[in-house]
Amino acid sequence: MAGKTLYDKLWDDHVVTQRDDGSCLLYIDRHLLHEVTSPQAFEGLQLAGRQPWRLSANVATPDHNVPTSKKERDQGIAGIEDDTSRIQVQTLDDNCKAFYIVEFGINDIRQGIVHVVGPEQGLTLPGMTVVCGDSHTATHGAFGCLAHGIGTSEVEHVLATQCLVQKKSKNMLVRVDGVLGKGVTPKDVVLAIIGKIGTAGGTGYAIEFGGQVFRDMSIEGRMTVCNMAIEAGARVGMVAVDDKTIEYVKGRSYAPKGEQWEQAVAYWNTLHSDDDAVFDAVVELNGAEIEPQVSWGTSPEMVIPVSKAVPTLEQAKDDVQRNDWTRAYQYMGLNAGQALADIQLDRVFIGSCTNSRIEDIRAAAEVVKGRKVAPSIKQAMIVPGSGLVKQQAEKEGLDKIFLEAGFEWREPGCSMCLAMNADKLQPGEHCASTSNRNFEGRQGNGGRTHLVSPAMAAAAAIAGHFVDVRSF
């Protein structure tokens, strides 16, 4: 009998019962909530007269709709100008109080993007099943978790039962060996993976990221990669537990202590795929060949190394891709064969659940230090992923580096990743963004998004256009 993959182990450890149709009822260890996908779920509980099944499993924080300017933030919920956004944040507050659920409110130092806050607080622990009403919940798989997004009706189901009916995915291994070159980051790795397999490449699979590159990678880097497993078509992305994982978790607020810690570590050390485990699909990349990446189109798979030009229709693999590229040229205002350096940028956004942790901010600051934002850039903003990330960055003096260079230093939240708050692109504007999606209108109606790493975004802000950060 073949060994088990990490995904197999996590799945099997959480099966409550298997149903006749092959689906399983899974136990959920951690449920993270935010203001956008939870109101209807809480309303469903109220209408049915139910209470959350296990209060301690649930933790909430507002992130999508919160303002990131200090003036608005200082006013708390009252500072949210948009009526719908304000009501959603207030409703989360009200529901958490009514149901006795822990919430890191809008001006709590622990508030932030839910996928930054969970690991930061030790709410995300190896071996857990973690769900949230947000597609980028795969982020938490960096800790050897089975983590994925759920819909609003499922949010209610988890609140009420602490269980969820799921169908098991197939297993995919994405192995990246070798050593990354200077200026090549985890964001570049995951963009290169998506560029190779496409946004449907992982559909129906749980992806395990393995190989030397991921063994060498920091935990925050692994979070960046797992965050974008969803853009590769998978619902789940994960990395095996190792000493780095355990060290990162140790001492965090919600991490186990004393004898429970020792017991947990003994279990966590089993959370890796067996040597004889068989995967349904294997994808391999050479890390030494990966360059800094820039997305040029309207899908994360429309991505190229910074040294390349916008592809021509002759390079498309089929008619579907030719049609997609033609539409992307038009929406993005680009020409086939155009050099990336010729794209005039308007804004730069460094933040999001993909790249707003302290390592990301340090990487950007290293590029920015002693330089100035180009006069042609209308706005360059740094949005830390949580109040604690912001606090740590300020302790290190990183905020001063950015402010002296002409960046805006913002309050934590999802910000310009998506057009659900005050931070938006205007029609036709090009933005170098460290977020995870470059769909039409994602950052604002008519906005044009280019996905890059924090270092590449910082370099673009200084130059006013895309440059190879390796030359900085």
UniProtKB/Swiss-Prot annotation:
What this protein needs as a cofactor is: [4Fe-4S] cluster
Q: What is this protein called?
A: 3-isopropylmalate dehydratase large subunit
Q: Which family does it belong to?
A: Belongs to the aconitase/IPM isomerase family. LeuC type 1 subfamily.
The record describes the protein's role as: Catalyzes the isomerization between 2-isopropylmalate and 3-isopropylmalate, via the formation of 2-isopropylmaleate.
Tell me the residue numbers annotated for binding [4Fe-4S] cluster.
Answer: C353, C414, C417
Its gene name is leuC
Q: In which pathway does it act?
A: Amino-acid biosynthesis; L-leucine biosynthesis; L-leucine from 3-methyl-2-oxobutanoate: step 2/4
> What Gene Ontology terms for biological process does this UniProt record contain?
L-leucine biosynthetic process
**Subunit structure as annotated in this protein's UniProt entry:** Heterodimer of LeuC and LeuD.
Q: Which reaction does it catalyse?
A: (2R,3S)-3-isopropylmalate = (2S)-2-isopropylmalate
Which InterPro entries does the record match to this protein? 3-IsopropMal_deHydase_lsu, Acnase/IPM_dHydase_lsu_aba_1/3, Acoase/IPM_deHydtase_lsu_aba, Aconitase_4Fe-4S_BS, Aconitase_4Fe-4S_dom, IPM_dehydratase_rel_enz, IPMI_cat
Per the UniProt entry, what species is this protein from, by scientific name? Acinetobacter baumannii (strain AB0057)
Q: How is the cofactor bound?
A: Binds 1 [4Fe-4S] cluster per subunit.
GO MF entries:
3-isopropylmalate dehydratase activity; 4 iron, 4 sulfur cluster binding; metal ion binding
Q: What class of enzyme is it?
A: lyase
EC number(s) reported in the record: 4.2.1.33
Alphabetized, the UniProt keywords read: 4Fe-4S, Amino-acid biosynthesis, Branched-chain amino acid biosynthesis, Iron, Iron-sulfur, Leucine biosynthesis, Lyase, Metal-binding
Q: So where does this one cross the membrane?
A: none
